[in-house]
Amino acid sequence: MMTRLEFCRRSAGGIAGMLASGAVPALVPASVLGKEAPSNKIALGVIGCGRIAHVYNVPSCLKQGGKAICDFIALSDVDLTRVRSMRQKLAGKDMQGRDLVADGRCFQDYRQLLADSAIDGVLIATPDFWHAQMAIEACRAGKDVFLQKPMALTIGEGRAILTAAKKYNRILRTGTQQRTEENFIHAVECVREGRIGKVVRVEVGVPDDPKEYNFPLEEPVPAEFDWNMWLGSTPVVPFTRLRCHQRGKNGAMNYARPAWMTIQLYTMGMVANWGAHHMDTAIRGLGEELGGPVSVEGTCVYPKRRLWDVHGDCDITWKYASGAEIKMASTRKYPCGVRFVGEKGDWVFCGFAGKQTKSDPVGVSADKVAGMPIAASRKGIIEAPAAKPLLRPMEHNREWVEEMRTRGPLAMPLEEAQRTSTACVLGYMAMKLGRKLKWDAKAERFVDDAQANSMLFREERDGFGVKQHLKELGMA
């Protein structure tokens, strides 16, 4: 199926060819060739108008010149108050003087948004358990996709997303921004160039989740909130703000960290939240982007709370065929970020603290790197630029828009994103099962472990989830 954007691109190319051959007069308006014409702007929709979309994704897509080539023209959320709030944020007119987001393009059911042929791509920023189904259905509808991390909650879901993107020839980008941030890129370059010798260990530090709010365990479903749709493939349970997202006084918008991020029915916790970012950098530094561990084991502490039950302190080890290990723990043990350790004790650290500067410290002790963008055990490791530099793409939301326009290549190839997602899922499963798991990365199966293999997909409520799409994807 040819999308609106692809039709415009091909039509412009055909007209340009006729101009070059003299088949049509040279005095043709620039808009006919698609230059700044309304039809040539990338039309985007948002599925999930909460914190991440409102504060990060939508503004980032539009900045750095993005406004010149894309518009958000449709919105969807099960909570219509959030749709209205996002519409106000995007208040404006298109090049023909029309409202960018019309009343007819504000939806409570995302499937209506996907059915709109005017939309070229969708930004999916919903609770984690919705990611796979929505991404697959968006690809099938001919939309390119920006999918928030984690990519999926199971290994089977991740493979199904990858299969759908390939089958329907869609650009699908995941929200792992460290591929576009200088300090993480340069740390990977230093490691891959052997500046710390053979890597024997990578330490990944992730934050803890917040304490549970003192909300009731059951509340009336708010007006304009489709609770059944919010639950999707998960079991039917009573509504409470402790399960979904908060609201401020008198129903005002509240874009604090949503409550669902702390419940195992809906997410995997920090192992796949911040872990999705840090594990990607760790795996990239080891050169295992298209590989996987041979085993994983882990333990964790599950907090005793009324409802919020994701893991607290964790201790997970992924072991690779090279002998290198990735170890993940909370920031009580490791600083938030990624530290590569070489066989002779040299190391490089990179973390969330802004961009690299010339004054970034070297020669600091490993327990003093918290809050630093990049640091190393001694001088000479991180100062010099890379002999073979890695790609320096633009900010990852804006990069997705550019990838839609040019049709690639992807700064974060989808196969690599799926492998990072798989690593996070493996860590979560090791904690849940409480034992060592042996993994065959090529077959994407556990070795001699029927119980673990039975968890490659989740149980799903009738009418929801990815299993209904497996046959069309050739996976059933």
Where on the chain are the PLM-derived regions?
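A contiguous active-site-proximal alpha/beta segment in oxidoreductase catalytic domains
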Residues: 144, 152-232
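Non-transmembrane alpha-helical segments in soluble domains
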Residues: 8, 62, 84-87, 111-114, ...
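Residues that mark the start of a beta-strand
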Residues: 41-45, 198, 325
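N-terminal glycine-/serine-/threonine-rich beta1-alpha1-beta2 phosphate-ribose binding loop
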Residues: 1-144, 156-171, 471-476
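Short basic (Lys/Arg) and small-residue
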Residues: 149
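Rossmann-like dinucleotide-binding domain that binds NAD(P)(H)
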Residues: 228-322
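Glycine-enriched catalytic-core subsegment of oxygenase/oxidase enzymes
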Residues: 34-35, 73-78, 82, 90, ...
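Core domains of carbohydrate- and sulfate-ester-processing enzymes
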Residues: 203-253, 358-360, 455-460, 467-468
